[in-house]
Amino acid sequence: MLLLFCICCAFIKLVLAEVNLTFVDYAKLPPKYAELLANLTDQHGMVLFDTADVRFEAYNYLVNNITEINTDTDACLCQLLTGQYTTDCYIFDDSVYEGPENINPSTSILIKD
């Protein structure tokens, strides 16, 4: 019985070693993006499971390369939320966030009813 338990523990450890988890740290994002992300995820944290995922790449771009909010960073935020690669996503008008109701029609799927 103990041997079976050890084998199961070793298997679980092996499986978990292959999983890359990244917890999205809202504090590292620009405040407007952090607020929007927190609201759209009902204040629950986000976890990215695969480093090859477009969401992981978008998150890294937003955390490491952002100097200003623009259409490129809007597209990255959409990629982070949807998991789909897109460049046709504009959230902030002149970098002023006025609430999720002002998200353009191409991102209406991001707004929860």
Swiss-Prot record:
Sites carrying sugar chains: 20, 39, 65
Signal recorded as keyword: yes
Keywords: Glycoprotein, Signal
Signal peptide start and end residues: 1-17
Claim: Signal is one of the keywords in the record: yes
Lineage top rank: taxon: Eukaryota
InterPro entries: UPF0321
Pfam family, one: DUF2430
Family that this chain belongs to: Belongs to the UPF0321 family.
Record's protein name: UPF0321 protein C569.02c
